[in-house]
């Protein structure tokens, strides 16, 4: 099992970390050195995407194309296969990624990657992002809340 936690020092609306992207040896020239990148963790993204900057830096060649949808709408996108090392040192090999139209990060980590791990974030005073790979099971928030209600707690106003 591998774990990772990042403390942001305040409540944030973007979950970012570093990651390492490299050429998948079956689909490209492995002479390009791995690239340390800024990763944006996006639970609303079905799949992961990389920036044109990373594609160019690694000399990635497309293996297919897809119709993708981002915040700016639908577009045709090439697909690349990469190797991705997460901050918890877990390496995902042969990950298909589309070309994303991104400004805030070099790679967008979507649910295709997040679903391989236990992933949560908390916001009590500061944002803390936690990842555990492989998945060990659920986080029993409902059971915890029901127990708090039985013991006299359990009021959670939206502020």
Q: Which residue ranges define each predicted feature?
A:
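Pepsin/retropepsin-fold aspartyl endopeptidases
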Residues: 1-159
């Amino acid at each position: 099992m591998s774990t990772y936690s990042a403390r942001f020092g305040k409540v944030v609306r973007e979950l970012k970390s570093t990651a390492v992207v490299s050429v998948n040896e079956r689909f490209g020239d492995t002479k390009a050195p791995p690239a340390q990148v800024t990763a944006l963790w996006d639970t609303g993204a079905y799949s992961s995407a990389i920036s044109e900057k990373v594609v160019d830096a690694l000399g990635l060649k497309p293996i297919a194309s897809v119709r993708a949808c981002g915040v700016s709408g639908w577009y045709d996108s090439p697909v690349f296969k990469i190797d991705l090392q997460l901050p918890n040192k877990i390496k995902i090999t042969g990950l298909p990624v589309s070309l994303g139209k991104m400004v805030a990060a070099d790679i967008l980590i979507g649910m295709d990657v997040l679903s391989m791990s236990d992933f949560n974030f908390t916001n009590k005073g500061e944002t803390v992002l936690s990842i555990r790979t492989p998945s060990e099971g659920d986080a029993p928030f409902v059971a915890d809340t029901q127990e708090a209600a039985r013991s006299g707690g359990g009021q959670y106003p939206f502020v």
